[in-house]
Amino acid sequence: APDELIVEEPMSIRLDGELIATTMRTPGDDFVLAVGFCVTEGVLHDVPVRSVRYCGQGPAAESEFNDVTVDTGGLAPTPTPRLGPASSSCGVCGTVAIGDLLERLRPLEAAPFDVEVLALMADRIDGQALFTTTGAVHAAVAFDRTGEPLVLREDIGR
């Protein structure tokens, strides 16, 4: 059987129409990625999202799947400025000042976790379709407190 290749493409993320980041991603869950990025940048903590859409207008809209806007009706605060595109690193790279990032972080409550449940999590990861066909992706998984997977997303491994 021929080898399968994974795709990676750039995606621009806009908040209320203003460009806030350009990142590389495996296409598929673009709206979730855009909203998640805004949440981790600290601009959606207390702000409702009115809509998420591709930015294409008119007859060319079908081809504008690399540009997503998160609309809050102008209620979101201005994101921390970045010096260039968002990288696939830790997320700090490209920010103008670390202090700007820390200003928007909220403390997390302590959440003790059963070590035995943690040990079982690796065995509960199923459904890596892209990895099965390409062997070239990694996954991120969110688990509930009992160790059951809630959501799994795959992306190109570096």
Language-model segments: residues:
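Intrinsically disordered, low-complexity regions enriched in acidic/Ser/Thr/Pro/Gln residues
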Residues: A1-A140, R145, V151-L152
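Active-site beta-loop-alpha junctions of metal-dependent nucleic acid enzymes
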Residues: D155-R158
